[in-house]
Amino acid sequence: MTAQKSKYFNRIMTMNTLLFSLLTVGFSQAYADVVLEKQVKITDDGLHFDGKDLNHGNIDSADPGEKYDFFFGPNISAHGDAVKTYKHYVFMTWYKGGKSERNVMLSRYNTQTQTIATIEFPHRHTGFRGNPLIGESHNTIGLAVSPNNGTIHMVYDLHAYDDNNHDGKFKDDFFRYSFSVENAADLPDDQFTLDKFVKDTSSISQGPDDYKHISMTGDIADKSNFARLTYPKFFTTTDGTLLLYMRLGGNNNGAYVFNRYDEETQTWSKFTKFNENNQKNFGNPYNWGLYGNMKYVNGKLRVGFQQRSSDNNDRYQYQNGVYYAYSDHPEGFGDWKNHKDDEITYPLVNSDEIKVLEPGDYISHQEANSVYIVGSFDWTVTKKGDVHFISKVRSTNRSRPDYEEEYLHSYKPAGADEFITTTDFTGASQIYTAGDNIYIVGLKNGRPYVERAKGGTNDFVRVYEATSGPVFDHGTLYIKDGKVYYYLMEKTSGNAMPLYLQIIDLDLESEANAPQVAFPSTSLTVEQGYEQLSLGIDATSSIEGRTIESVTLYLNDELVRTDTTVPYLFGHASKPHETGAMGWKDEHEPNPNPLGPGEHIFKAVAVDSEGDTGLATMRLTVQSNAPMVSFPTQLIEVDEGYEKLSVSVDASSSVEGRTIESVTLFINGEEVRTDTTIPYLWGHGSKPHETGAMGWREDHAPNPNPFLAGEYVFTAIATDSQGEQSETSMTLIVNGEATPPIVTWPNEVVTVTEGYKRLGITIEAEASSENATIESVTLYRNDELVRVDTKYKWNFGHSFAPYEFGAMGWLETHEPNPSPLLAGTHTFKVVAKDSTGLEGEAFMTLIVLPPAGPSISFDEPDIELMTGYESLSVSTYVATVNESVDIISVALFIDDVLVRENLEAPYVWGDANHPNELLSLEVGSYEFKAIARDTNDQVSEVSLLVSITLFGDFDGDNDVDRTDVRAFSSAIRSGEALDQRYDFNEDGVVDRSDTRGLTKICSRPRCAS
């Protein structure tokens, strides 16, 4: 769909007389006071990454010393879903600094007693892909407290891990979930301790002090449901149910998944997908990932995101679009709809079903990868149902001469059919809601500020800004019951920095009773010297019985006047100057202090009969009467030794009767010459050297001081007949001797496995001079010519030339490469040649590894069963070494006897289609072996031990006799948990009355005696 577009422009008033009546369309909502209620320091030792921002090219150079290098970003504490409230407590998660500590921490602040209790967990941040020398900012700690049973829940320190990736470093530890016993959240400070959290005592526990659980269901057999997840975020529904959402998969092939907490069983459900990943498998033309959030707002589970497509040849460098959906199911398990309330496919496959708008439409670029839509994206929904998105779009290349950038605010007021999109928005990274308002909360010069607007509008007003106190580096926040809980890290130094909590009261209660105040418009533009500006203020109370006592007007925070009678009119004929106007009647003396050029803020404060106040603001822009002056262009580039440069200046006055007296040119602050006649021209034939040129006519002597390579700022100052001045600037870049093209590989080192099917690489090549173009890019392999490419894009190894990097080929039309690259190290060189004949080169190392077999693991731990068992199934997780290799089959053997060979996933035995194939095993131990074979003919295997014991054999002697009967009776008396199969009399419990049933299966006579 096409969203409604609306670009807002201030109205420029060309007449000198203005009269604003109460009928003028426009509105600015009244607001009560927003105040900092409390600030408290939580710790001095929050972990922060203070080293280098690494990438895949220098990942092996991490600092082993004190500096903490990082991947993705420097923030990990006061980051992510790290602050929540429960009753009168505020809970905060963080990692302990410095670099050698890294423990997971949980702090609880009691707002009544002002005390802080902190728990230190044994787990330490494992670092980027398991390297503790490199911090990873994505490994945040998600936090929730159940309002229904006081349990605390944390998911942390993970980024799409599973048993097999990153060299198996996260085997049996790829998901980290910790939870407390009931009512731990309320305990006194001295009892708020680590032992209130439940240890992992499963067969894959990491040790006696392991508080991390790999599954949230309570069953480690479900662990595969918790693999490859990132970005934990908890929600609380209107009835107190906890939900958790995470991202499954990667950047351009992912899904949002969520699950639910059951207070009765104190376990969580398995994850449910909002959308499918691997969307091509479900008929979509491409795979896509999500960059945004799932949120529970206004009583519903919702999603809002930008899409990152696997199509790398569209005009978007990374993300595109704005997408939105919501669920009418109380916990999101179905009934999903788009913003038009149309039902959508669930799980979602085609994202176009929920597309709202395309930010890329707000700039003009159409070339491949020319549009950049990353960052400054968020969304929210108000209590009454206004939907708001903020986003940013810009040119990918910041250096291009036609660079474009727009901040967008797209909103759909409750009850509206379409979204309104405005570029009259200064931008933000997050947007929040409380009640019917929307908020922007952030840091300015390191201190918090709050801006607020009524939902369904773009009328943002700054209602709070701190001007003193600590200077902060970053923070994350949570809004609850009209208060902002802003969790912040102070900007100091090192890898252990202080953490603070600020509680900011949004004063929603007072706002509900506050008078409603409105200017005729939220903004206005006038010309300098305007004669009349009459402002009628509308002030009313929505509370029955209340009246407006007064309206006070302020101009730039200076008191103008208080009016106590309707109409509340300022700048009328008796007081023409109070709004900055000159005056318009014959009896009006000219204003001795008119408003000068620039922006000015009018503020109206209304007081009602109960003393409650409301305010509104209006921005007035006064345009200057100074001359208008401009160069033809803002940037000129020439080559060193240029012969001619004539520079003209356009200067005029917008005020009738005024003329331009002179224009003076300065270069790098040094005066060149003043010109008093049109055209205002420098560097003409009579003065060829004044702009740094050599001269171009035979009668021109060579310039003894020509401009050398560098940057020069030309400034023109125009003066009009009233002595008013304006200036403008232009930059001249003098290029030195031409430099060769810049050519780069996406990665300087690429590693593949022998037999790889596909390797295509696009080379970046750019001429150093703006006047030159790239004519060709030539590829060499181990110093042998591969191909000369003369057409952009510089793409090698594509489907029409699949063998250029030694690959086998991947399409049905590709014959197998007769000379593939074998295991070893190979050097590739590209040479870019520009239109001036200059050449630049770059090298790439291709490492071909010997073929590796697939990775395979059983999804189950070792199994123990008793004879007579009724069901048994096992499954394997199998992955190839890379996407170019496929699995041919997985076969299961029991003690080297083939059970069945599976030719396609899922690789399960004993499933519904083959329920009996693993039954009837006799007493003994069996080796279950799964063997996987891939298209490289590589084989890997994994084994599982299955032990079958005799039903009723308690002493392990392979028969059932009186000794076993006595052992059974003893177990009953001591209260041991026994298998439900021993409930012989089928009364629902295993007790002494079942002893007779055991005697009936004795394998020896006189068993009961």
Curated annotation (Swiss-Prot):
Residues 1-32 form the signal peptide. It comes from Glaciecola sp. (strain KUL10). Transmembrane segments: none annotated. The keyword Metal-binding applies. Its EC number is 4.2.2.-. Ca(2+) 2 binds at residues 311, 314, 316. It holds the Pfam family BNR_4. GO terms for biological process: polysaccharide catabolic process. GO terms for molecular function: lyase activity; metal ion binding. Keywords: Calcium, Lyase, Metal-binding, Signal. Substrate binds at residues 137-138, 291, 308, 372. The record marks 247 as: Neutralizes the sugar carboxylate group at subsite +1. This is Ulvan lyase, long isoform. The keyword Transmembrane helix does not apply. It comes from the Bacteria. The lineage of its organism: Bacteria, Pseudomonadati, Pseudomonadota, Gammaproteobacteria, Alteromonadales. The active site is at 138 (proton donor/acceptor). Ulvan lyase involved in ulvan degradation. Ulvan is the main polysaccharide component of the Ulvales (green seaweed) cell wall. It is composed of disaccharide building blocks comprising 3-sulfated rhamnose (Rha3S) linked to D-glucuronic acid (GlcA), L-iduronic acid (IduA), or D-xylose (Xyl). Ulvan lyase catalyzes preferentially the endolytic cleavage of the glycosidic bond between Rha3S and the uronic acid GlcA, but not IduA, producing oligosaccharides that have unsaturated 4-deoxy-L-threo-hex-4-enopyranosiduronic acid (deltaUA) at the non-reducing end. Belongs to the polysaccharide lyase 24 family. Ca(2+) 1 binds at residues 200, 210, 212. InterPro entries: Dockerin_dom_sf, Ig-like_fold.
